[in-house]
Amino acid sequence: MSAQVSLELHHRISQFLFHEASLLDDWKFRDWLEQLDKEIRYTMRTTVNAQTRDRRKGVQPPTTWIFNDTKDQLERRIARLETGMAWAEEPPSRTRHLISNCQISETDIPNVFAVRVNYLLYRAQKERDETFYVGTRFDKVRRLEDDNWRLLERDIVLDQAVITSHNLSVLF
């Protein structure tokens, strides 16, 4: 495991992630895009339940991408939300992003830090539609020269093997 970061650095990176989550909850998607590095990789794969005997052998069942997005693709998703023609978001979802168990370590790349957080994303829409997404995120954040931060990678791992929501139009 790589070296853990100082308490001060841990606090600053955590605050960046909390701010980023609040931008998503407040539907400030253009501001959220500004928090992303131009080289962002935003990914989520399907979760497959592997048998214990297979896991012991190191055998992983095949998965497929749910998201494998670049910044351009994320910009297009947001532009679509802004048109009012994204029917999956009419009326708009109300979300709450909760992150915890934040573990931050250095990487081999200067000013890039690996972050592991557990998350709960609550989504409410219409009168009775509620969905909880629970899992772990593996992020990489980059410190800029002006001491600001950018999200470089986000790999979203859902605990659920079956997604029961009508769609996945929310951002994690």
Swiss-Prot record:
The protein's matches in Pfam families, at most eight in alphabetical order, are given as: Ring_hydroxyl_B
Keywords noted in UniProt: Aromatic hydrocarbons catabolism, Dioxygenase, NAD, Oxidoreductase
Q: In the record, what terms sit under GO molecular function?
A: 3-phenylpropionate dioxygenase activity
Biological process annotations from GO: 3-phenylpropionate catabolic process
EC number(s) recorded for this UniProt protein: 1.14.12.19
Could you give the subunit structure recorded for this chain?
This dioxygenase system consists of four proteins: the two subunits of the hydroxylase component (HcaE and HcaF), a ferredoxin (HcaC) and a ferredoxin reductase (HcaD).
Q: Which family does it belong to?
A: Belongs to the bacterial ring-hydroxylating dioxygenase beta subunit family.
Q: What is the name of this protein?
A: 3-phenylpropionate/cinnamic acid dioxygenase subunit beta
Give the originating organism: Shigella sonnei (strain Ss046)
The gene is hcaF
